């Protein structure tokens, strides 16, 4: 037996041993947000117990079983008996009392994002005398910085029952986006970019989650029905949420995605082992925007399908997650082309302070200009042990632009480099200066770069 075989066997054994002894984490955008904001330490709150500080499970393992509650008003009585304001008003104590008495977790995220950009005017190429009468006239777009984005995202999870028959959890999440002055879509047109400068380039209302999940007693099988979005699982900790991590379109979500922002359907999730998770499901194909819940669409017999596999190992370096998402969308009036897409995500803690991640995604068809993307980056949370909200990140995305998706496309590729530094101010408020550098804008042949400067103020309760 060679030395390499022995070394490989030893490393695999060490990884397996560590895996069996440690908790595994499969990323879910809204569940993670609820868990993160319901485990914050308040400046005036009493010191949490050892069990609370060490618990890393999502949602409600430390909740009082709802089967012990008697009567409809018992949650209110239990909340009063918790006396959350006994030692002064504390957001953390109020949320902890609500969780213990009614099995409810709440997260409120409100961010204000001003963005300054350059160039400010789009470029119209000069036409030769042969072009007159034959080429379409290109309009010039001018935008005045800054564009101000106001984004509000409330989320909640309610454990309806927790008994020997399993656990029933209702989850809801809604995103409201408004702009003052210019919006990001106009700014992107002026800069002539294939990708937007943030995750929500225009005014939006998104019902991204409205689901009921039945977790069966063995905790390895769950069935979820209702309105949901694949954006919740397509990503890693910091490249899938504009309010927490990176801001640019290519680094805050899957820029090639053609699936819905929220649509009715169902999915079955199975966990063969503690470190693996498999999911298969379907959705109504008509509701692309997710702005409302459209029950009547379920009878139109057009559905999108997806399959998802996740592996969350824990080795001597730290925890990680590696996932693959495959999906198929149907042709509907709101999206006049059938597509098939994929997204491969990888993330790994190299140490307790260093987190690396990457994504490779693509899609068939010509629904959006970007049809392939390769991105990678790193982030460091609470590097100086000053505030848990401190976060530093830098990443790069290479976007392949389909020439036939837009008549003005001049380049096949567009690259964005982004860096930010989130600075926590207390347990709930943070400020994050952010810089985006776009190399070779896809729609602007006379310009080698474009720049975006942002300052994100985020209140996370």
From Swiss-Prot:
Q: Which domain of life is it from?
A: Bacteria
Name of the featured protein:
Porin AaxA
List, alphabetically, the InterPro entries matched: Carb-sel_porin_OprB (IPR007049), OprB_sf (IPR038673)
Q: What does the UniProt entry say about where the protein is found?
A: Cell outer membrane
Q: Which GO terms describe its molecular function?
A: porin activity
* Family under the similarity heading: Belongs to the OprB family.
Q: Which UniProt keywords apply?
A: Amino-acid transport, Cell outer membrane, Ion transport, Membrane, Porin, Signal, Transmembrane, Transmembrane beta strand, Transport, Virulence
Q: Which residues form the signal peptide?
A: 1-22
Q: Name one GO biological process term.
A: carbohydrate transport
What is the recorded function of this protein according to its Swiss-Prot or TrEMBL entry?
Answer: Facilitates L-arginine uptake, as part of the AaxABC system. The arginine uptake by the bacterium in the macrophage may be a virulence factor against the host innate immune response.
Task: Give the record's GO CC terms.
Answer: cell outer membrane; pore complex
Q: How does it sit in the membrane?
A: Multi-pass membrane protein
Q: Which organism is it from?
A: Chlamydia trachomatis serovar A (strain ATCC VR-571B / DSM 19440 / HAR-13)
């Amino acid at each position: 037996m060679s030395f390499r075989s022995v070394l490989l066997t030893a490393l695999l054994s060490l990884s397996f041993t560590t895996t069996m002894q440690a908790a595994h984490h499969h990323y879910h955008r809204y569940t993670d947000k609820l868990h993160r904001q319901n485990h914050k330490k308040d400046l005036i709150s009493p010191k949490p117990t050892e069990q609370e500080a060490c618990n890393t499970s999502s949602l409600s393992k430390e909740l009082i079983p709802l089967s012990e509650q008697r009567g409809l008003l018992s949650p209110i009585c239990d909340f009063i008996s918790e006396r959350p304001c006994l030692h002064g008003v504390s957001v953390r104590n109020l949320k902890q009392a609500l969780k213990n008495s009614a099995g409810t977790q709440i997260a409120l995220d409100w961010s204000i994002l001003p963005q300054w950009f350059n160039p400010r005017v789009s470029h119209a190429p000069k036409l030769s005398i042969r072009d007159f009468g034959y080429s379409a006239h290109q309009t010039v777009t001018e935008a005045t910085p800054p564009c101000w984005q106001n984004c509000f995202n409330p989320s909640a999870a309610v454990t309806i029952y927790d008994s020997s028959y399993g656990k029933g959890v209702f989850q809801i999440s809604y995103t409201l986006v408004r702009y003052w002055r210019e919006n990001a879509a106009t700014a992107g047109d002026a800069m002539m970019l294939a990708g937007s400068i943030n995750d929500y380039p225009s005014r939006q209302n998104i019902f991204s989650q409205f689901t009921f999940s039945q977790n069966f007693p063995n905790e390895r099988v769950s069935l979820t029905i209702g309105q949901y979005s694949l954006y919740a699982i397509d990503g890693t900790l910091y490249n899938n949420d504009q309010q927490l991590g990176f801001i640019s379109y290519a680094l805050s979500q899957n820029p090639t995605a053609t699936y819905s922002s929220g649509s009715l359907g169902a999915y079955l999730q199975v966990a063969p082992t503690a470190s693996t998770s498999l999911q298969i499901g379907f959705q109504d194909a008509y509701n692309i925007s997710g702005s409302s819940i459209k029950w009547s669409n379920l009878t139109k017999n057009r559905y999108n399908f997806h399959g998802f596999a996740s592996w969350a190992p824990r080795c001597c370096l730290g925890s990680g997650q590696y996932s693959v998402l495959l999906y198929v969308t149907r042709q509907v009036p709101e999206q006049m082309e059938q597509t098939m897409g994929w997204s491969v995500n990888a993330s790994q803690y190299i140490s307790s302070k260093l987190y690396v991640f990457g994504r490779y995604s693509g899609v068939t068809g010509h629904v959006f200009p970007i049809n392939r993307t390769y991105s990678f980056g790193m982030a460091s949370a609470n590097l100086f042990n000053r505030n848990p909200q401190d976060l530093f990140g830098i990443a790069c995305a290479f976007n392949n632009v389909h020439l036939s998706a837009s008549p003005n496309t001049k380049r096949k590729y567009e690259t964005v480099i982004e860096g930010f530094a989130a600075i926590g101010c207390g347990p709930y408020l943070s400020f994050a200066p952010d810089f985006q550098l776009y190399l070779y804008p896809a729609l602007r042949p006379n310009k080698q770069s474009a720049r975006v400067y942002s300052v994100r103020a985020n209140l996370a309760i």
